Amino acid sequence: MDTNQELKTSEYLKGIVSNLPEKPGIYQYLNAEGTIIYVGKAKNLKRRVYSYFSKEHQPGKTRVLVSKIADIRYIVVNSEEDALLLENNLIKKYKPRYNVLLKDDKTYPSICVQNEYFPRVFKTRRIIRNGSSYYGPYSHSPSMHAVLDLIKHLYPLRTCNLNLSPENIRAGKFNVCLEYHIKNCAGPCIGLQSQEEYLKNIAEIKEILKGNTQEISRLLYQRMQDLAAEMKFEEAQKVKEKYALIENYRSKSEVVSSVLHNIDVFSIEEDGEKSAFINYLHITNGAINQAFTFEYKKKLNETKEELLTLGIIEMRERYKSASREIIVPFDIEIELNDVTFTIPQRGDKKKLLELSLLNVKQYKADRMKQAEKLNPEQRSMRLMKEIQQELHLDRLPMQIECFDNSNIQGTDAVAACVVFKKAKPSKSDYRKYNIKTVVGADDYASMKEVVRRRYQRAIEEESPLPDLIITDGGKGQMEVVRQVMEELQLDIPIAGLAKDRKHRTSEVLFGFPPQTIGIKQHSPLFRLLEQIQDEVHRFAITFHRDKRSKRQVASALDNIKGIGEKTKTALLKEFKSVKRIKEATIEEVSAIIGESKAKIIKEGLDNH
């Protein structure tokens, strides 16, 4: 890889790492050929992946790994345990080169029901394809041991390694061991338990291991109650602990669920008119063993249904999926042989769909953040396009102007106009207005005066007009602005921002008669509108306070006879406020304006 390419890759990876979510999940490192070279788990994806690229985290093997990374993928999950299980499944599937080099390839244990005449049940870390049944893997060892212990207490099973073939048993080759004498084994080795009876127990054990433990749970609960009734509290407590563990075992996770087998899960998230993101999860034997999110660039304004259909065909072909059930978020017009489409409303399937949606939304957000960092103008364009779409504007709102009034019972009435260009404050274009024609507290008349003055002047000076006017208020404010637009024969869209009782932006109004526009709170667009409203309020109220303060200062000194403008200016320059002049000693005031005037000032302020 040449130096320029290395620099591009480095910047690309930095962009991904800086936008990783601070959530549990797994991450995958890919080389330049697109091969997964490492899979890892993390409680906090951003912190963990960042550690590989920090200078202090550079042992030899890690340096080699980091030098090979050309791309990073990740999957968000809901818990650390889910991340452990998913990491294990993906390592087994992809066998990444650097997982072997960098860490012990830990295999989570499973429970094996051995394929033999009298099957043994035991934990193992090795999967041998000899017809035996395997259940797991288990990331939580206590749960696994609780299940094994439960099985041990419910069913007498052999634990020996003897070859219990019918011929060997008939030949009398074996003797019972200690397990028989302590009633842990029924003695099939000497013919004391038939294969039929033994296999009946094995069939029930397999049901437990599949997660069908409701009946066993009921038995444990009953046993716990019986022991408590017999005042055997210590034994009851032990059974209670087992009951709690089996109940924990029964609770299913989003990543591993013993009742879900061979299912595909798809979700989609659009990015305006440009593209759509699709997430694909493949569930095999209750575990996620495929996860992929990809982007479709729209060419012919395709619908979500059309894009999702394309995505389903593409992913099933790419991953050779033969799943007979596909979970989707909405109805789509597609028929596949022997395939059922499900839109889940509750339960484990609903959780899987939510997990897929979580991943596709996170992927979309991360892609947008990366793009906006590379091109800051892109964020502004996206927000302006959103406003255009939500309000059905004819053109992009490149310039937005917002008005607000401020007064206290009609005194010191002022107004302000803030200007946002390309979704950013343009402070050099902000304007303050003293209300000239309105007497008393009349917000509507004040708004009308200021809007008329601003746009009358803009017309006369041929200044650029805004693409959208926003009022800091509801329907009444919008109506007076509309009247001015009609009077000046201007066609500028008008929106209103209403506040709740706590003076927080609560809704966006548009149209005549004004209608509430459903913009999701806390979305980037809503935050922009909230910023505009907060900014015009701040600007107006600051101007109002300044004006009120100057009036109060002026009136206090103006009422003192014999004090001219030069004296007032000198005092305010030194002491900054009337309050400080009043608090100063006569000597301090005399040093500025002389003793005789100082006495007049002090007496005048004391009597004010």
Swiss-Prot record:
Subcellular locations according to the entry: Cytoplasm
SUPFAM superfamilies associated with the record: C-terminal UvrC-binding domain of UvrB, GIY-YIG endonuclease, RuvA domain 2-like
Domain GIY-YIG: 22-100
Cystine connections: none
Predominant localisation class: cytoplasm
GO molecular function: DNA binding; excinuclease ABC activity
Record keyword Transferase present: no
Cellular component terms per the entry's GO annotation: cytoplasm; excinuclease repair complex
Transmembrane segments: none
Any single biological process term in GO: SOS response
Subunit organization: Interacts with UvrB in an incision complex.
Record's protein name: UvrABC system protein C
Gene from which this protein is expressed: uvrC
